[in-house]
Regions:
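Glycine-rich ThDP/TPP pyrophosphate-binding loop and its adjacent helix/strand module
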Residues: 1-110
C-alpha cells in the first residue's frame, strides 16, 4: 500500500529514508519503495537524503526515478541540469540500475 504521497517538492525520499531507518532500528524485514520524478531531484532535500541513506546502510530502501524530464515549471534539463544523475547517486555509494520503467520484468529483476 502507499503510506504517503509526498508530492513534487522532494519530500518522498527524506520520508522514505526515515521510514527505512526506523525499520532497520526495529530489525523489521521490510522494504521502502520511493517513486520520484527527475524534476523533484532538483530539490536539496533529495540530495541530503541521497547522501545520508548509504551512511545509514539502508539496503531496505529502493528508489525509482521517473526520468521524464518534466517538472512544475517546464523541462527539467532546461531549468537545472541534474545529469549525469546515475553518477551522482553512485558518488554517494548507491547501487544504480537503469531500467525501462514500462517493462514490468525489468522492474522485478532490478
Amino acid at each position: 500500500y502507499i503510506e504517503i504521497s509526498g508530492g513534487s517538492l522532494g519530500h518522498g525520499l527524506p520520508i522514505g529514508v526515515g521510514m527505512a531507518y526506523s525499520m532497520k532500528l526495529k530489525k523489521e524485514k521490510r522494504k521502502v519503495f520511493v517513486l520520484m520524478g527527475d524534476g523533484e531531484s532538483q530539490e536539496g532535500s533529495v540530495w541530503e537524503s541521497a547522501m545520508i541513506a548509504p551512511k545509514l546502510n539502508l539496503d531496505n530502501l529502493i528508489v525509482f526515478i521517473d526520468r521524464n524530464n518534466l517538472q512544475g515549471y517546464g523541462r527539467a534539463d532546461e531549468l537545472l541540469s541534474y545529469e549525469p544523475i546515475d553518477d551522482k547517486f553512485r558518488t554517494f555509494n548507491w547501487e544504480v540500475i537503469r531500467i525501462d520503467g514500462h517493462n514490468v520484468n525489468e522492474i522485478i529483476k532490478a
